Amino acid sequence: MSSTEGGAKRVAEDGSEVSEAKRVGRIEGVAQLKPEYVVAGAAQLRAAESDEELTSERMVEPEGGTRKKSKKARGQNKNRDNRQAKEEHQLCPRLAQGNADACAFGAQCRYLHDVRTYLEHKTAEIECPQFTGCPVFAATGRCPMGFKCRFLSSHCNMETLELATTPEDERAKLWSVNHEVNHIASDRKLDLVKRRAPFPRSEHVLEIIDAIQQEFRDEMQGAAAAPEGAVAEVPQVQQREEQLSNKRARQRELYAQYHETRYFAQEKKPLDLHHKKIVSPLTTVGNLPFRRLMRQLGADVTYSEMALAVPLIQGTNSEWALPKAHCSELPGFGVQLACSKPWQAAKAAEALADNVGDGLSEINLNSGCPIDLLYRQGSGSALLDNPARMIRCLNAMNYVSKDVPVSVKLRTGTRDGHPIALGLCKRLVMETDVAAITLHGRTRQQRYTRSADWDYVGQVADALRSYETERAEKLKDREGKLRIQFVGNGDCNNWEDWYRHLENENVDSVMVARGALIKPWIFEEVDARQYIDKSSSERLEILRDYARFSMDHWGTDEYGIALCRRYFCEFMSFFHRYVPMGICERYPVLLNERPPNWRGRDDLETLLGSTDAADWIKLSEQFFGPTPDKFVFQPKHKSNSYAPSVQ
């Protein structure tokens, strides 16, 4: 941890301690900019940015009770609703490519079947400076949206309504470098929805875990005294007693067979994170287009947004969209899973391994998410308070995930002043077969109010290696385990931090989160070992790539463009926080430092640094055309809210 990050102290001549900030004559927590770029008459600092975990619509707690009096828009939008409206006049999806015979419903179909009627009601085509034609058609040789595309005239004869085609061999060449993977088959998903999908490995390992737990409970409670007298000769009672007796006999059999074994140990694909450039799992903003952008800019390992175990088991569409990845993410793509109980962990991991396992390098158990709703349900960082349950979840996942390695992401603890990661890591080494451990150097209670404690992260890394040596001695007569990968996480937003943290040889790599959102080219700096001052036009090109990847993923129809614009604004809520190196007196600017109000070196740079959500909307028009009146975007901070009626 750097001296500036930790607020290091120096001893003055009179023996008193002087903070590093005061020693070098700067204001602690404030970014130092060149005077000519500070906006005159605006001495106040920019509003504090919220770094709390974003909450997906999938995790919003429904509001209950009576309607409360409206309050002034302050603080965070805890229950944001950024769902976009769909077209009023919708063309039948089967006719999007022009095949009138494709719809089985015929005249009873609730969608339009007349293409010309649809085109009369369709929103006007997109006209924007960055894209003159359909970017999806240009990239893949085919536009899946067909007549619904907002760039339709670029791949359709508008007089004959004949869609353009690309030769098959050329399309195959384009597809080989630009397609998405990890799609679950529709019949498999339907089996999950109908609750008829089998989970044989999960059921077996849960039996083993239950048997070991039951034996432990019996030992703690002591043998129950035999009841006096005969069992009542009631058929139902006798049947239940017989079932319990058979179940207990089965549990004793499983306990005898497995309690002294590492039953969860399975042969896995090797997981190599050593000095890899890793992007953290990020809810909402860590979507496929962003991950694809980060791969293009040098990332080696990416993770899905956090997926919830129960909706995965139930075959929910929105949850099964999360494991999807771009082909450029392979190898090195992992799915992060949140759960509260071993049965959830086992069945979700088995479903992932069976349906998309070929496209996964690891399955990661989230034991660090601080979101209140998940914590109250026993998921995320709540598992830190129940290490035994976390271990059961990990062992169940490891047993069912075939050859896909299992990893875990932790925080230092749940409460300030009570770090538990050191002791927990010993149990993880001794009692599980995790392939990797990621430690975020903050507690749940701390959130982002102070810097990450990299001193503690280093202590845990050192202890982990000694625990591995101890385990090797204990299990010397058994097959040796691979070295557990240890990854540190927290506050890394420049190449100097990256290499400073890796000076500890026990730390395999550093995971980057906010640093990658604010400065996506951070891994280019890591490779070059120098700061790169991107111009406004270069940063606009990054946004152009993000917009193109978004349209590849969400589509170019009206609803797809609305989603692209919404997630573009979510990305801008972090991207705008970059303070250009050329306007700074001291660099780098730390994540917890707030700049004064500033102007850029040109108008575009000023626009890219705007904190106003309306400016993010304005910027999106360069890629997605004019913003429709029904577009909805609520940023996380209410003071930045944008509504069509307020221009």
From Swiss-Prot:
The keyword Nucleotide-binding does not apply. SUPFAM superfamilies: FMN-linked oxidoreductases (SSF51395). PROSITE patterns: UPF0034, ZF_C3H1. It comes from Eremothecium gossypii (strain ATCC 10895 / CBS 109.51 / FGSC 9923 / NRRL Y-1056) (Yeast). The active site is at residue 369. It is found in: Cytoplasm; Nucleus. Its cofactor is FMN. GO terms for biological process: mRNA processing. It catalyses: 5,6-dihydrouridine(47) in tRNA + NAD(+) = uridine(47) in tRNA + NADH + H(+); 5,6-dihydrouridine(47) in tRNA + NADP(+) = uridine(47) in tRNA + NADPH + H(+); a 5,6-dihydrouridine in mRNA + NAD(+) = a uridine in mRNA + NADH + H(+); a 5,6-dihydrouridine in mRNA + NADP(+) = a uridine in mRNA + NADPH + H(+). Disulfide bonds: none annotated. Residues 67-77 have a biased composition (Basic residues). GO terms for molecular function: flavin adenine dinucleotide binding; mRNA dihydrouridine synthase activity; tRNA dihydrouridine synthase activity; tRNA-dihydrouridine47 synthase activity; zinc ion binding. This is tRNA-dihydrouridine(47) synthase [NAD(P)(+)]. The lineage of its organism: Eukaryota, Fungi, Dikarya, Ascomycota, Saccharomycotina. GO terms for cellular component: cytoplasm; nuclear periphery. The keyword Repressor does not apply.
